[in-house]
Amino acid sequence: GVRFNWDTDVDQLKWHADGITVTSSTNGEQVTERFDAFVVCAGVGSRRLASMLGDRVNIYPVKGYSITVPLGDAASQSSAPWVSLLDDDAKIVTSRLGQARFRVAGTAEFNGFNRDIRADRVKPLVDWTRNLFPEVDTSACVPWAGLRPMNPNMMPKVGAGRRPGVYYNTGHGHLGWTLSGATAAMVAEQMRGDRVVTAMPRPRLSFS
C-alpha cells in the first residue's frame, strides 16, 4: 500500500549502509523513520535534499508566468482555440481548459525562489491574447507565477544517486506533466532491478 503525508516538511535526511532515515515535521510534530530506498522528486527543493544525501544536483528555480482567462460569454468561448498553440517568436503557449477557461503561459525569469507576480511580465500575455483573439474578454484574467525546476543542460535528473538506495526523478522544467510519469516508471523499474538508467549521450559538435 501507500501512505500520503500531507503538509509535511522534510527536516533532515541521513544515509546509512542499511537505509535512509527521514526526519519530518507535520503540524509541529517531528518524527524520524527509516526506509530502504528514497526517491527525490521535490521540484525546486530537490537541490537541498540531494545535498543531505551526498549528491550535487544543480536544479534551480526558473519562474514562469501564466494567465487564466475566464470564458464567461458565448463570443469568448467560440473564439478561444481548442487546440494548444505555441508561438515560437513570442515564447508563449496556450491550453484550453474545458468550456470556460483558456490559459496563456510564457516567459522565464531567474529570481531565486521569489513568486511575486510582476505586472510587466503579465501584460505581454494579456496583450498577445487581445491581439490574436480580440473577441475573447480578458478583463477578468487571473495571473499566476510558478517555479520550474531546471537543470543547466535542460535535462531532468533521473535514476540512481551516488549512494545505494538513493534515486532521483526531478528537474523536468516546464515539461513536468509531460515527462515525469514516464521517468517515474523508469525509476521504479531501476529500483526493482529491471532497468539500468543511463545518461543520454552528449551530441557531438562539429564546425566547418
Name each model-derived stretch.
Residues 1-11:
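A conserved beta-strand/loop element that lines the FAD pocket in flavoprotein oxidoreductases
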Residues 2, 131-135, 192-196:
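Generic secondary-structure signature for well-ordered alpha-helical cores
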Residues 5, 39, 167-169:
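Hydrophobic/aromatic beta-strand patches that form the interior of the parallel beta-sheet core
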Residues 7, 105-107, 169:
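Short beta-strands and strand-loop turn motifs
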Residues 12-19, 24, 32-33, 37-162:
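Active-site substrate-recognition segment that forms the wall
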Residues 28:
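FAD-binding core/adjacent interface of flavoenzyme oxidoreductases
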Residues 71, 155-208:
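C-terminal lid/capping helical subdomain adjacent to the catalytic/cofactor pocket in oxidative enzymes
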